[in-house]
Curated annotation (Swiss-Prot):
<dbReference type="Pfam" id="PF01043">
    <property type="entry name" value="SecA_PP_bind"/>
</dbReference>
<keyword id="KW-0793">Thylakoid</keyword>
<keyword id="KW-0067">ATP-binding</keyword>
<keyword id="KW-1278">Translocase</keyword>
<keyword id="KW-0150">Chloroplast</keyword>
<dbReference type="InterPro" id="IPR044722">
    <property type="entry name" value="SecA_SF2_C"/>
</dbReference>
<keyword id="KW-0934">Plastid</keyword>
<dbReference type="GO" id="GO:0009535">
    <property type="term" value="C:chloroplast thylakoid membrane"/>
</dbReference>
<protein>
    <recommendedName>
        <fullName>Protein translocase subunit SecA</fullName>
        <ecNumber>7.4.2.8</ecNumber>
    </recommendedName>
</protein>
<dbReference type="InterPro" id="IPR027417">
    <property type="entry name" value="P-loop_NTPase"/>
</dbReference>
<dbReference type="InterPro" id="IPR020937">
    <property type="entry name" value="SecA_CS"/>
</dbReference>
<dbReference type="InterPro" id="IPR011130">
    <property type="entry name" value="SecA_preprotein_X-link_dom"/>
</dbReference>
<dbReference type="GO" id="GO:0009570">
    <property type="term" value="C:chloroplast stroma"/>
</dbReference>
<dbReference type="InterPro" id="IPR036266">
    <property type="entry name" value="SecA_Wing/Scaffold_sf"/>
</dbReference>
<dbReference type="InterPro" id="IPR000185">
    <property type="entry name" value="SecA"/>
</dbReference>
<feature type="binding site">
    <location>
        <position position="487"/>
    </location>
    <ligand>
        <name>ATP</name>
    </ligand>
</feature>
<dbReference type="InterPro" id="IPR011115">
    <property type="entry name" value="SecA_DEAD"/>
</dbReference>
Length: 878
């Protein structure tokens, strides 16, 4: 019986699962062609009825059969339940190793039958490519086309991939393509369809961890760069506590009175807060760069550039820059070339991006701790899926040491002990710097290790390292969750091992390319390879490393063998694979007797969920495993929340420095501290959402109007509509005036704006009724526009339509960019309203609305002015 929190629904899920499984005997008798034909039948059925629930059992059973034929895997009932939950627009919480990749395919196939496109969103390109490759093999049996969005693709290729039934892509590529589509000048440049259904893998990482970071497309702004250098000099002359304080909880700097005066003296200015030249933002950013943003933790220096490191995943974020001058401050600190500060051209948060979908769901192993936020903001319920086998992971109590030095020594000694007995160990660190510190200590202890952090030189080996982290005598150091999404299999992954060994061996004996001389191939495998060396390898002609790698990949992926050479290599691969399967199985049994994979955490994160992600690397498919955190009172979390008190307590008890504290009370205190931080960041994200919702509504209004104009082939009506609206708006002001001279000025402004070159008889116009003036101006507008259209058509047919669209899109884009900047300034300053007993959010909404109305008015008037009054330079030769 499934152990469900949602026990009242279990019978409903079991009933559907039984229906799906009952169809196995039907579909396993179908030929490949008959199975493929089922897709069109289901499409016809779903289009006719629009009832997805009725065909769900059939669709899942068909996909289940395709998975079995392509991979040989039989889906567990819990995977079917996970897919049902995804189809209901909920989040399926499934533990590591439970087969989330295949679960997503079931739901994706069902929803692809609507012919509207399904997006499967992953956190990085490696996972997107890996999953898309597997999906192509499976859906080849069902006549479903799989797309993959690659960072290097041009727009036409992207358009083709988005038009597929199911498209795999990263969250950042999805967001940037959305923004680029809403900046396109030609409708042919649009790559995306309307958003229909998305399944987000590691949904908590995207919707929670990255919620505070908006996606931004930016362009250069004209700012001076010397201020950053000057501010960096000032920051280095200021001292903590005497001139400023660090707010570690909020990651902020508080400049005190002494620091303000000292800064003003150094800069030789009277006011650090002068509105005309506010130095304060440069000084605060320089101090943040000095004290809060740490090299090899928050960023790395790569090719003379500052590259951000994601605080949650440890991944480097190429192309991303901190805004508001912070990135420039860090460039000044690191003595790198300071790049021009950018202005925002388009932006959107992941919160609002994914709310654009008609239907949304996701998967993760850790969502329960953020359940309230996911439901409140995204209307997504979290359903915990039971594991297929009983979870045998043992989470040991935290060990807390007095200093960081002692903690790292203890971690290294623990790794040494595990290496001595052969137990595979995964150590999670919070920064690149700390991962390299541990690596250095292990090197001194002569303990071999694999280093998995997001430094560029280590990225290429990420999947190889994490895949083999479950082998005997393997110590793996991983920065945060680098390698997340790749299973750690006890005893090793025989497919990867066989491919690697075969590729290295062939490269070596044929002297084709450089090979990894440090990679150790087992004696049994080397014997097999050497025994078939002469007969099957040397006689092959024109083998190169690409052929070898591709041939082996084709076998792993069950692709067709196309030539005799590949066929020979495939036979060798199968022999090596079978031997590795035997070796890995035997090794797994030995590791289980040692206690399974051992996961060591070296610092508690601000979120319990991130800790759980690290722990979750152990306990795959019922494997015996354990985890433990090694902490110190100098860790950030403990330093902020009572580390000094615990240190005094240890001092009073005369506890030896090398002796750790192991206490359930301390564990509860740490969990309590994490809950406080989680609550704080939840409030931050909630506030961000509330404020961004205002801008999002305006963004949608602008983007809908822009797309309507972009796709339109006839924009004359829009121009006239803008002109008539402008006339009406200006006549409102005209009718409110009592002064004749002011009324005359307004009429003159209208006529000038619309290029209505007629003689104004003040007495006649001023004595007209409101509706008569409006009718008269509307009539003159159309006459003048007809004349201008006729003139431009004589110059070149279709020219007027091109000009209309160009002016419309150009002015919408320019006005929107300026509007974003004004909204950003408004958001920064609005907090001060709370001191005047005003609700900042209400004030923000009111002022943002006024700014939006002003922007719309500006767009209309500028487009009309350019269309009616611009002069064209005619090229006589063309």
């Amino acid at each position: 019986m499934f152990n469900f929190l949602f026990s009242n629904k279990i019978n409903q899920y079991q009933r559907i699962v039984k229906q799906i499984n009952s169809l196995d005997s039907t579909y396993n008798k179908y030929s490949d062609q008959e199975l493929k034909q089922q897709t069109n039948k289901l499409k016809d059925q779903i289009i006719a009825t629009q009832d997805i629930d009725t065909i769900l059992p059939k669709a899942f059973a068909i996909t289940k059969e395709a998975i079995k034929r392509a991979t040989g895997l039989l889906l567990f009932d819990v995977q079917l339940i996970g897919a049902i939950i995804l189809n209901q627009g909920k989040i399926a919480e499934m533990k590591t190793g439970e087969g989330k990749t295949l679960v997503a395919m079931l739901t994706a196939y069902l929803n692809s039958l609507f012919n509207k496109g399904v997006h499967i969103v992953t956190v990085n390109e490696y996972l997107a490519k890996r999953d898309a490759t597997l999906a192509k093999q499976i859906f080849e049996y069902l006549n479903i086309h799989i797309g993959i969005i690659d960072q290097s693709m041009h727009s036409q290729e992207r358009k083709k991939q988005y038009s597929c039934d199911i498209t795999y892509l990263t969250n950042s590529e999805l967001g940037f393509d959305y923004l680029r589509d809403n900046m396109a000048i030609q409708k042919e440049d649009l790559v995306q369809r309307d958003f229909f259904f998305a399944i987000i893998d590691e949904i908590d990482s995207i919707l929670i961890d990255e919620a505070r970071t908006p996606l931004i497309i930016s362009g250069p702004a004209n700012n001076k760069l010397t201020e950053y250098l000057e501010a960096n000099k000032v920051a280095n002359l200021l001292n903590q506590n005497t001139d400023y304080e660090i707010d570690e909880k909020n990651k902020n700097i508080i400049l005190n009175e002494n620091g303000i005066k000292k800064s003003e003296n150094i800069l030789d200015i009277n006011n650090l807060y002068d509105i005309q030249k506010p130095w304060i933002k440069y000084i605060l950013n320089a101090l943040k760069a000095k004290e809060i943003f740490i090299k090899n933790k928050d960023y790395i220096v790569k090719n003379n550039e500052i590259v951000i490191v994601d605080e949650f995943t440890g991944r480097i974020m190429e192309g991303r820059r901190w805004s508001d001058g912070l990135h420039q401050a860090i460039e000044a600190k690191e003595k790198q070339k300071i790049q021009q500060e950018n202005k925002t051209l388009a932006s959107i948060t992941y919160q609002n991006l994914f709310l654009l979908y008609e239907k949304l769901s996701g998967m993760t192993g850790t969502a329960k701790t953020e359940e309230a936020e996911l439901e409140q903001i995204y209307k997504l319920k979290v359903v915990e899926i039971p594991t297929n086998k009983l979870n045998q992971r043992k989470d040991l109590s935290d060990l807390v040491y007095k200093t960081e030095y002692v903690k790292w020594k203890a971690v290294a000694n623990e790794c040494f002990d595990m290496y001595q007995i052969g137990r595979p160990t995964l150590v999670g660190t919070t920064s690149i710097e700390k991962s390299e510190l541990l690596a250095k200590i292990l090197k001194e202890l002569q303990v071999p290790y694999n280093l998995l952090n997001r430094k560029p030189e280590n990225i290429t080996r990420e999947s190889e390292i994490i895949t083999q982290a479950g082998r005997k005598y393997t110590i793996t150091i991983s920065t945060n969750m680098a390698g997340r999404g790749t299973d750690i299999i006890l005893g090793g992954n025989p497919q990867i091992l066989a491919k690697t060994a075969l590729t290295i061996h062939i490269n070596k004996i044929l002297n084709l390319t450089q090979y990894n001389t440090n990679y150790k191939i087992e004696n049994e495998i080397t014997y097999i390879l050497n025994s078939i060396n002469n007969t099957l390898l040397i006689n092959n002609i024109d083998i190169n490393s690409q052929d070898i790698s591709q041939s082996i990949n084709n076998i792993i992926n069950n692709n067709m063998i196309q030539d005799a050479k590949s066929y020979k290599i495939s036979n060798i691969y199968k022999i090596v694979l079978n031997k590795y399967k035997q070796l890995c199985h035997n090794e797994k049994q030995e590791i289980i007797t040692l206690g399974g994979l051992y996961v060591i955490g070296t610092e508690r994160h601000e979120s319990r969920r991130i800790d759980n992600q690290l722990r979750g690397r152990s306990g795959r498919q019922g494997d015996l495993r354990s985890s433990r955190f090694f902490l110190s009172l100098q860790d950030n979390l403990l330093k902020i929340f009572g580390g000094d008190k615990i240190s005094d307590f240890m001092q009073n008890l005369n506890i030896d420095e090398d002796m750790p504290i192991e206490s359930s009370i301390l564990n509860k205190s740490l969990s309590s501290a994490q809950k406080k931080i989680e609550a704080y960041f939840y409030d931050v994200r909630k506030q961000l959402f509330e404020y961004d919702e205002v801008l999002n509504n305006q963004r949608q209004a602008i983007y809908i109007e822009r797309k309507r104009l972009l796709k339109s082939n006839y924009t004359r009506d829009c121009i006239l509509e803008y002109a008539e609206s402008t006339i009406e708006e200006m006549l409102v002001t005209y009718n409110q005036q009592t002064d004749i001279s002011e009324k005359t000025k307004i009429l003159s402004k209208i006529l000038k704006l619309l290029n209505l070159n007629i003689y104004i008889n003040n007495n006649i116009l001023l004595n007209m009724e409101e509706n008569d003036i409006k009718s008269f101006l509307f009539e003159q507008l159309r006459i003048t526009y007809d004349l201008r259209e006729s003139y431009l058509e004589q110059l070149r047919p279709g020219l007027i339509r091109q000009l209309e669209k160009y002016y419309l899109l150009q002015q919408i884009d320019y006005a929107w960019q300026e509007h974003i900047n004004k909204i950003s300034i408004l958001k920064e300053s609005i907090g001060w309203r709370s001191y005047g007993q005003q609700d900042p959010l209400i004030e923000y909404k009111n002022e943002a609305f006024n700014l939006f109305i002003n922007m719309v008015t500006y767009i209309r008037q500028t487009v009309i002015y350019l269309t009616m009054r611009s002069r064209l330079i005619v090229n006589i030769d063309n």
